[in-house]
């Protein structure tokens, strides 16, 4: 056994990294081969097998190293390509930003334009402007009509007064009332254009002069009262004109004008109803007759006292619409059979027709009057009913 020599092969060295380079270098540390001694045979040739394997391993490692180096050299190129792509993206974003900035401004201008179009349409439909324009046109036509009447000097003054009245009316706060005044002036124009007597024209001129002074100081309640009085006098003056058809027309127009001024100048509290210069309240709760009188006094009013057929019809309609039995300020508590209002005035004989059939019958000591159905009924005063209060509108109340 000592004669034979053992083949010894130094194994392939470990791969190491050369710290002096930025790349990676792999190499075999030592390749030592032990020559075989003895006979050259197939067995001896086979002793070279490990050497072949080592060469193959070295070749494989060299190929891997080359591939790694290729990839490493490609990295700066890809980084450069990525940087150029970022530059392109940045430029595109810059252009997009500028475009969006212009688009936003343009869209805002478009929006402003549309708003102006809508505002133009809205302003064009404003009732105040159109109504004032119509009032101006009507007064211009009235000027032409009045200018053709016989008394030039007086009619010219009337025209001037109406012009000033136009300016005063143009400053009134409620647009709907401006429209009412415009309609009334239109009717008045037609009536004045056909007045037959110069003396009556003079009276109208004087009344319009007073009306101008009153309208010029409209905010004061005392002046509102003056307007009412002047219109009443004007109504009386026109009522004396000889032409009956024109009298009636002008009277009706002045009545309507008075109503329009009352609605414009006078106000009722919330939940109260305006009618012919007064405010009316129908309660939502029930009390006996005496407590109803007290309830009205507590709000500066009076359990309703009826003064005219028009007022009776209005109140009867209000009561029937609400389907409520309601106390009025009428009783015969002081003397049985003698009906008297709470203000001390007696019941007019012309009002007897408003009692329901068979009433008053004093059945069961019934001494207080109520609205019942389509007329009046007497009832016991301790019965709980709704009640109706009445008071003048604010513009006619003494300060």
Swiss-Prot record:
The chain crosses the membrane at residues 50-70. It comes from the Eukaryota. A motif (Endocytosis signal) lies at residues 14-15. The keyword Membrane applies. Residues 71-399 are extracellular. Residues 1-49 are cytoplasmic. Disulfide bonds join 265-395, 268-279, 296-389, 368-381. It holds the Pfam family Lectin_C. Residues 108-269 are annotated as: 7 X approximate tandem repeats. InterPro entries: C-type_lectin-like, C-type_lectin-like/link_sf, C-type_lectin/snaclec_domain, C-type_lectin_CS, CD209-like_CTLD, CTDL_fold. Glycans are attached at residues 92, 361. Residues 274-390 form the C-type lectin domain. One of its GO terms (cellular component) is membrane. Sequence repeats lie at residues 108-130, 131-153, 154-176, 177-199, 200-222, 223-245, 246-268. GO terms for biological process: adaptive immune response; endocytosis; innate immune response. It is found in: Membrane. GO terms for molecular function: D-mannose binding; metal ion binding. PROSITE patterns: C_TYPE_LECTIN_1, C_TYPE_LECTIN_2. CDD domains: CLECT_DC-SIGN_like. Probable pathogen-recognition receptor involved in peripheral immune surveillance in liver. May mediate the endocytosis of pathogens which are subsequently degraded in lysosomal compartments. Probably recognizes in a calcium-dependent manner high mannose N-linked oligosaccharides in a variety of pathogen antigens. Is a receptor for ICAM3, probably by binding to mannose-like carbohydrates. Homotetramer. The tandem repeat domain, also called neck domain, mediates oligomerization. This is C-type lectin domain family 4 member M. It comes from Hylobates lar (Lar gibbon). The gene is CLEC4M.
